[in-house]
Amino acid sequence: MSNVIVVIGPGSIGQAIARRVSAGKHVLLAGLRQENTEAAAEVLSNAGFEVSTATVDVSSRESVHALVQTATALGDVTGVIHAAGVSPSQASPETILSVDLYGTALVLEEFGNVIAPGGAGVMIASQSGHGLGALTAEEDAALAMTPADELLGQPMLQPDQVRDSLHAYQLSKRGNALRVMAEAVRWGKRGARVNTISPGIIFTPMAKDELTGPGGEGYRRMIELCPAGRGGTPDEVATVGALLMGPDGGFITGSDFLMDGGLTAAYRFGELAP
């Protein structure tokens, strides 16, 4: 049977990581919009990768479970790259929580049941999760360990507690990192690893939406004043992804890798400090 790499959200970052880790393996690309998924599959296929596609709505357990069944029919799932999501300028708080928080919890739960020994997963979180103030120990535990289907019922995630789309995004991305830390224990019992990457401003179509949206001036200021003095590229995220999914990352699991050009540092100790 083939070794299968599942890529959920086959945009710039998902494709870049897949290129680094999928040679000689079967790539299953999954996304909400079939036309985008097929376009990404054509690019990878023309580059020599063995590719198939599927449609998935990560906010639906039934849809994610169907994707798991498709993947396991192809072979042993040795890698999961979850890069699907929506940004603050693209969706309401309710949609962001459903896709970015609940959706990631579903992917972790469902693929955690089938990941092959020696396998690895990378979930794309965000620097925004590091921009959220400290939560209580009880809130951390709720985000990390509440069963996925009960997660959106938590008091801290109700409409009267979530201020706006940015706040929903920050909570979701903080939750992603906490969730992966907890899920690493369960994945480890199968001999597998899982980590998050929290990128800063990476030049993807999603970032362009933010840069041209209502908060664009603030995003440009963040790029200018972060220590790196620039945004990042999907290939740079893929470098970290390849480490986490490969043998050199064999002792790394349950971790969150912040790669933001020093943006968080600038907010805490530099010119972006409040």
What are these regions (language model features)?
Residues M1-L28:
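Canonical Rossmann dinucleotide-binding motif of NAD(H)/NADP(H)-dependent dehydrogenases/reductases
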Residues G24-A39:
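Conserved glycine-rich Rossmann-like NAD(P)H-binding loop of the short-chain dehydrogenase/reductase
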Residues L44-E62:
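Rossmann-fold cofactor-recognition segment
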Residues G85-Q90, P117-R190, I201-T204:
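Catalytic loop of short-chain dehydrogenase/reductase
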Residues L106, Q161, Y169, R174-A177, ...:
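C-terminal helical subdomain
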Residues T253-P274:
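Short C-terminal tail/terminal secondary-structure segment
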